[in-house]
């Protein structure tokens, strides 16, 4: 990759107050305005966190091929209306292909729920060999990146394809071949020298501190799982009895009052602790496109496929930029910045294979 030298590192939206930096382990350029003390009475309810946790509970499950997915009834009116607004990327492929003709395509993919099924144990979210083959074929035609909430090392270990670009921790840890001014050299798990872009690097000590404390705070809650993704920490409650959800939310919420430079976000059956910086999956897409020398191309067509709320930032970047489109992976109706939809990972695989088949035909017809 060639990284343009004028790329700016992430910045905070608000000015920085004076705080104990040794306690936080971060530099002043990543500080935000003073934390506003939340309401004392029933914090998690007043802030809507418990409602958000409950709303993420799936309607019902059924087995679709090799995937355990959330399913809404086919004859449900809301589902049909939703499909009109977010049509299937497979059924709409002719329209997508027409837009893609003579364009430079770049493909961005989430991992969990997109390339692998959502499962009770995150460690068992294994990508099938057929899906890996489909992704590898896509990467042989188009620049392809995985942007995951998992740590970069973990998602690389799960995918195992050297042809791809990897961004972990929701884009806060990007491995690149560029040696631009905002990147630094490191060594990967294979001992190879790589260049990394980590806009939240100063937060590593405080995230580790929060992770270790949350592990202790969740020990007595059956089914709770805490993970350290290096630049963010997550508390999974998919296997927790619903009566214990308020306890989890309250403990996490209360503990974070000590860390005004961290924020709490919500995903699919997971609470995530993240640095308060102006960076997300959408910014990661912009960075990768710039790194690839594609950001100012008029003939660019990025495609982003993801299933989580964190993918909405990437969908919005593509929609607001009026180029490319997002594809939401969901079998239940929900509002999104995406243009198209796919029901589950099996349909993602089918779409990727269709994209490769189209690319082969285009190559044969043009001779390039």
Curated annotation (Swiss-Prot):
Q: Which reaction does it catalyse?
A: alpha,alpha-trehalose 6-phosphate + H2O = alpha,alpha-trehalose + phosphate
Annotated pathway? Glycan biosynthesis; trehalose biosynthesis
Entry EC number(s)? 3.1.3.12
Q: Which InterPro entries match?
A: HAD-like_sf, HAD-SF_hydro_IIB, HAD_sf, OTSB-like, Trehalose_PPase
SUPFAM superfamilies for this protein = HAD-like
Needed cofactors: a divalent metal cation
- UniProt keyword annotation of Nucleus present: no
Report the GO molecular function annotations.
Answer: trehalose-phosphatase activity
Looking at the keywords, is Membrane present?
A: no
Pfam families reported in the protein's UniProt record: Trehalose_PPase
Give the Gene3D superfamilies listed for this entry: HAD superfamily/HAD-like
The alphabetized UniProt keywords are:
Hydrolase, Stress response
The UniProt annotation puts the region (Disordered) at 1-23
One annotated GO biological process: trehalose biosynthetic process
| Family per record | Belongs to the trehalose phosphatase family.
For this protein, the record's PANTHER family field holds:
TREHALOSE 6-PHOSPHATE PHOSPHATASE, TREHALOSE-PHOSPHATE PHOSPHATASE F-RELATED
Q: What's the protein here called?
A: Probable trehalose-phosphate phosphatase F
Q: Could you tell me which species this protein originates from?
A: Arabidopsis thaliana (Mouse-ear cress)
């Amino acid at each position: 990759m060639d990284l343009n030298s004028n790329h700016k590192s992430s910045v905070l939206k608000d000015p920085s107050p004076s705080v104990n930096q040794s306690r936080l382990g971060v530099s002043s350029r990543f500080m935000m305005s003073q934390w506003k003390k939340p309401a004392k009475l029933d914090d998690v309810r007043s802030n809507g966190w418990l409602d958000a946790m409950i709303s993420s509970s799936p309607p019902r499950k059924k087995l679709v091929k090799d995937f355990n997915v959330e399913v809404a009834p086919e004859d449900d009116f809301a589902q049909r209306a939703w499909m009109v607004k977010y049509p299937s990327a497979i059924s709409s492929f002719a329209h997508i292909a027409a837009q893609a003709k003579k364009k430079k395509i770049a493909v961005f993919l989430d991992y969990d729920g997109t390339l692998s099924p959502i499962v009770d144990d995150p460690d068992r979210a294994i990508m099938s060999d057929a899906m890996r083959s489909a992704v590898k074929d896509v990467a042989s035609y188009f620049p392809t990146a995985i942007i995951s909430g998992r740590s970069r090392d973990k998602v690389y270990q799960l995918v195992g394809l050297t042809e791809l670009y990897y961004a972990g921790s929701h884009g806060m840890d990007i491995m690149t071949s560029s040696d631009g001014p905002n990147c630094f050299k490191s060594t990967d798990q294979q001992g190879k020298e790589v260049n990394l872009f980590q806009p939240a690097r100063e937060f590593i000590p405080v995230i580790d501190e929060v992770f270790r404390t949350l592990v202790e705070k969740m020990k007595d809650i059956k089914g709770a799982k805490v993970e350290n993704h290096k630049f963010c920490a997550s508390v999974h409650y998919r296997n927790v009895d619903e009566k214990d959800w308020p306890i989890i939310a309250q403990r996490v919420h209360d503990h974070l009052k000590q860390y005004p430079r961290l924020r709490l976000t919500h995903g699919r059956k997971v609470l995530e602790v993240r640095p308060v910086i102006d960076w997300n999956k959408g910014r990661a897409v912009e960075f990768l496109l710039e790194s690839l020398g594609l950001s100012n191309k008029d003939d660019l067509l990025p495609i982003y496929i993801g299933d989580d709320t964190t993918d909405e930032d990437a969908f919005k970047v593509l929609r607001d930029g009026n180029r490319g489109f997002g594809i939401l992976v969901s079998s239940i109706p929900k509002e999104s910045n995406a243009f198209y939809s796919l029901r589950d990972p099996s349909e993602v695989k089918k779409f990727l294979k269709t994209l490769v088949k189209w690319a082969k035909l285009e190559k044969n017809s043009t001779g390039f």
